Amino acid sequence: MRVVGLSEDDGGPGPTRVFAHRLVHGTDPAVVAHDAGWTVVKPLTATREEDGEIVLTLLVRPLDGERRPHEPGRGRDAGLELPPGAEPEVRQRVAAYAVVLSERGLLATEYSDRTAVPGRWGMPGGGIDDGEQPADAVLREVGEETDQTVVLDELVSVQTSHWVGRSPRGTLEDFQAVRLVYRATCPEPREPRVLDVGGTTESARWVPLAEWPTLSWTHNWEQLLGSLLP
């Protein structure tokens, strides 16, 4: 993934590109911006270029005393035991998710026992296939995990996590998740059902907005929803 910063602070007729850097494994895009002398105002777009690389474009402004964003470091799956001399496979995975609202509330998905957080809840979405645009990926994933048709809105957040654990296939990985999070609406909500049976999604449901804090969310999703929802 490549991270590009655009600034409107030069007085020109439109945003100016002020940096473009590759996202080093384990690093957050906000740290990339800070180390280049900028702070993130908001994410703008995420697109796959002709060379196959995903480019994340951020609106930024010059640093004005902001501290370097905190990076929690590399975690580890609970209960994971590393054999002596084990070398995890380094993997950076870019995925796309949607915070979907409808007249029935918030669309939520429950993680299956193929994940490290079975029984916890998150947003529908998942990995971006080779050659696929992030916006197309999130529409596909929402359909596979919930059987809903949604209308995508703006990119609202970029989250990263970094840990050592085992993939659903059992591979030991030094894994960085980069999550592109969009807003979306569902004009014609129906009863959710998981079409991709046997994957990382156990179930899906509509949650009335007043009740969303009662679910057992993963930490990252709970934090994000607290900033986006009433």
Language model region names:
Residues T47-V99:
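Acidic, metal-coordinating catalytic segment for phosphate/diphosphate chemistry
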Residues R22-V41, M123-V156:
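The catalytic Nudix box helix
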Residues R48-V55, E87-E89, Q159-R179:
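Acidic pyrophosphate-coordinating catalytic loop
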Residues M1-V18, L82-G122, V150-E154, C186:
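N-terminal strand-loop-strand
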Residues M1-L56, V60:
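Intrinsically disordered, low-complexity, charged terminal extensions of DNA damage-control enzymes
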Residues F175-R190:
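Phosphate/ribose-recognition catalytic cores of enzymes acting on nucleotide-derived substrates
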Residues L59, V100, V181-T185, R205-P208:
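Short, well-ordered beta-strand micro-motif
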